[in-house]
């Protein structure tokens, strides 16, 4: 895999409750000089979701995986296995995908460091990072990981990025208003573009 690949696959919930953490992940990735990728980046009805995810995984050197939302949900109550499945795809690509995938690296988040052992014990050898549901904690962990695993000393510290993220969130309503975007209709592409514009202004 080419050294210049700075694409980061984001595997996490996309619901409203998780949105603060998702936004923190995307902001941190972009602020650190990388490109955030996820299944929301393209709306193509001719391409099924699994194929789209496989394509993105194939193209990304790095991965951010949050397995904190595997609890039962809905009626009937069933567990949510999308995130563990996509984590498995990423780890499988690294192990079996050939030479260009061997440099893949990922960080795994959960609410608590050892909670995952109760439902996905096969990854017990992995280093799980706890965010406790707090964007600030996630940003600190993610920024340090990106800096270490990319070898890029220009990636800022997580506390500094966290402060920038707070300022960005405060400015966001005015930014959306200027772009004539209702917060409820903002797509992943819109949010990416807004973050890039804010950071490069």
Which stretches of residues belong to each language-model region?
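Short glycine-enriched loops at secondary-structure junctions
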Residues: 14-16, 109-115, 134
């Amino acid at each position: 895999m080419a050294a210049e690949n700075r694409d980061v696959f984001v595997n996490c919930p996309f619901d409203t409750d998780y949105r603060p953490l998702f936004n923190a992940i995307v902001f941190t990735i972009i602020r650190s000089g990388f490109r955030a990728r996820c299944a929301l980046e393209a709306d193509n009805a001719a391409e099924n979701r699994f194929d789209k995810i496989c394509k993105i995984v194939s193209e990304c050197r790095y991965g951010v995986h949050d397995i904190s939302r595997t609890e039962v949900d809905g009626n009937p109550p069933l567990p949510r296995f999308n995130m563990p499945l996509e984590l498995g795809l990423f780890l499988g690509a690294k192990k079996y995908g050939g030479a260009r995938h061997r440099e893949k690296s990922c960080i795994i988040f959960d609410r608590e460091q050892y909670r995952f052992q109760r439902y996905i014990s096969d990854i017990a050898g992995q280093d799980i990072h706890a965010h406790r549901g707090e964007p600030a904690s996630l940003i600190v962990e993610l920024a340090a990981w990106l800096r270490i695993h990319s070898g890029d000393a220009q990636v800022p510290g997580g506390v500094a990025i966290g402060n920038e993220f707070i300022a960005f969130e405060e400015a966001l309503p005015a930014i959306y208003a200027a772009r004539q975007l209702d917060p409820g209709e903002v797509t992943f592409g819109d949010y990416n573009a807004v973050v890039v514009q804010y950071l490069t202004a």
